[in-house]
Curated annotation (Swiss-Prot):
Lineage: Archaea, Methanobacteriati, Methanobacteriota, Methanomada group, Methanopyri
NCBIfam families given in the database record: pimt, PRK00312.1, PRK13942.1
Official protein name in the record: Protein-L-isoaspartate O-methyltransferase
Name of encoding gene: pcm
Species: Methanopyrus kandleri (strain AV19 / DSM 6324 / JCM 9639 / NBRC 100938)
Gene Ontology terms for molecular function: protein-L-isoaspartate (D-aspartate) O-methyltransferase activity
Active site, renumbered: S66
Record function comment: Catalyzes the methyl esterification of L-isoaspartyl residues in peptides and proteins that result from spontaneous decomposition of normal L-aspartyl and L-asparaginyl residues. It plays a role in the repair and/or degradation of damaged proteins.
Cellular compartments per GO CC: cytoplasm
Broad class of where this protein is predominantly found: cytoplasm
EC number(s) recorded for this UniProt protein: 2.1.1.77
Length: 226
């Protein structure tokens, strides 16, 4: 293992231990996934030395990679299992999709929809160099409408703040499935766990405040005027 890799590995171990001690990581499965995925491979080159600081980082086009504690919270709530098919709305750098892929592989997979083509390319490259492209498919499009060709999904993860839960995503969620989504305004939201019962009833639970970039799309916020 190269010296840089050892340094990053130790930093990743310290971060995961801290997230466990603070209660953000509650399961061994999520701890192992976050230990395995090299976050420094999913941030811009000039920010690699900050990859294991618990804060969001800019990835271009006004978008960010979420803080590790928020990735842990959302992944614990989502509870992806081996064999699950997961839809992610907002690929960003591809990091969160890689963490989820660790939890659903070898037979599960992640479909992630990104509206910004340059970020979709960034995510694809990051996933390819880390080997997660075998389990993650990156698409360009309006994620608020989901991706009907692969529906229904066991789990849906939304990584941007929505004004409400998009109806298309509810329709594409399997009975018995779970969705994690930030709901609120363009700046501050609450993190919701949305569950669809086996008979199709929708249940929502709130899990505290958060701050995500706005979810832009037909069933989200409109693109701000320039």
């Amino acid at each position: 293992m190269a010296e840089d890799d050892k340094v990053f590995r130790r930093a990743r171990e310290r971060l995961v231990e801290r997230l466990k001690s603070l209660g953000y990581i509650r399961s061994n499965r999520v701890a192992e996934a976050m230990l395995k995925v090299p976050r420094h491979e999913f941030v811009p080159e000039d920010l690699r030395d900050r990859a294991y600081v618990d804060s969001p980082l800019p990835i271009g086009r006004g978008q960010t990679i979420s803080a590790p504690h928020m990735v842990a919270i959302m992944t614990e709530l989502l509870d992806p299992r081996p064999g699950h098919k997961v839809l992610e709305v907002g690929a960003g750098s591809g990091y969160h999709a890689a963490v989820v892929a660790e939890l659903v592989k070898p037979d599960g997979r992640v479909i992630t929809v990104e509206r910004i083509p340059e970020l979709a390319d960034f995510a694809r490259n990051n996933l390819k160099k880390t080997g997660y492209d075998r389990f993650v498919k990156v698409l360009v499009g309006d994620g608020t409408k989901g991706y009907p060709p692969e529906a229904p999904y066991d789990r849906i993860l939304v990584t941007a703040g929505a004004p409400d839960v998009p109806e298309s995503l509810l329709e594409q969620l399997k009975p018995g499935g779970k969705m994690v989504i930030p709901v609120g305004d363009r700046h501050m939201q609450e993190l919701w766990l949305v569950e669809k019962t086996e008979d199709g009833e929708i249940r929502r639970r709130r899990h505290g405040g958060c701050a995500f970039v706005p979810l832009i799309g037909e069933e989200g916020f409109q693109e701000p005027e320039s």
